Amino acid sequence: TIYFNPAAMTQLSGVQVSAGVNALMASAHQTNRGSYRSVPGSTARVPVTGNDGGQPFESVIPVPNFYASAQVTDRLWLGLGVNAPFGLKLEYDDGFFGRYDSIYTDLKTYNIQPSAAFKLNDNFSIGGGVDVQYVKANLTNALPQVSPLVTTDGFTKLKGDDWTVGWNAGLFYTNGTTNVGVHYRSGINHKLKGTQTISGLVTPLSAANGEFDASAPLDLPDIVTVSFMHKLTPNLRAMITGKWYGWSSFKGIEVTSATGTTNKELDYKDSYSVSLGGEYDFSPAFTLRAGTMFDRSPTNPQHLTTRVPDGDRVWLTGGATWNISPAFALNVAYAHTWVEKANIIRPDSYFPSPATVTATTLAQTSGNADQVAASLTARF
């Protein structure tokens, strides 16, 4: 509630504290469709060979969360949320055919959200909060040598972090039978600062090896959420939620360092998701829920990358709440996600002319994901 619409905190009586974890189990597979590299001063195309990179995701990726709300008066609520709204971690095996595109990616965000909600009357509430967000990134990929006869690759590593502040606000309406929520979360424009390390390049590029101060912007999207819930019977509720993501603010990975500015164009598009679901109270102690969602990928088909092996997604979810006692509730959920196959055509150019080498990654990506979530809520 606090993260998705703090205005709905007015539906939480007393003091409530919830702590939980999402366990993400993702898989992806890359198939080489004829990747190649150029040779400076020639029109030749040299095949880039290698293995398929193996399973790039860890077997289980835990993502914790924490929320607390307190009813201060009959009209005022205060809350705090801590979560990780965006993240990605994957690593391909040594010798991956797409190594000039990506090898290792570790992006983490941590969001701390103090919030407040105010009940205007029995039907309407407003709420909002501040998003204090930390991001940390670590990205690596191989670098092609000028001569294709050199059997070893160069290597580049970029790491950086940043703290930035955003905001969010929402409106909540209820008449006891129908709930409607509208929420807006601002985009957050990070400016990561850290280092870029280049190693392994041989003559005539060996002078480029070294560690340099570097910076890179990271623009995370603004999000608009509209949700609707209606009681069909005293025990059965239907829900629909639509979200819009302003991902078009994310243009690519632009790194500025002493060696110059490089840009890996991604050109994300605005995206959306639509979910339908229902929940049924079998008893005052036990509630069962299920739903489905279509989630449009923001990735641009013209600029796909093995660093983000993504496509449109279809979700199928189920979950339950067990009210163990008036003071404690256990929430569990499971989701399976089907990810659409996509073809990657990724040309990336390295080094100034006349030593420019363009490595073109041609791949087909496919994958899916499972998530298991559990949380414990305490009421005081």
Q: Can you say where each PLM-predicted feature lies in the sequence?
A:
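N-terminal periplasmic accessory domains that precede
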Residues: 2-7
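Transmembrane beta-strand segments of Gram-negative outer membrane beta-barrel proteins
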Residues: 10-29
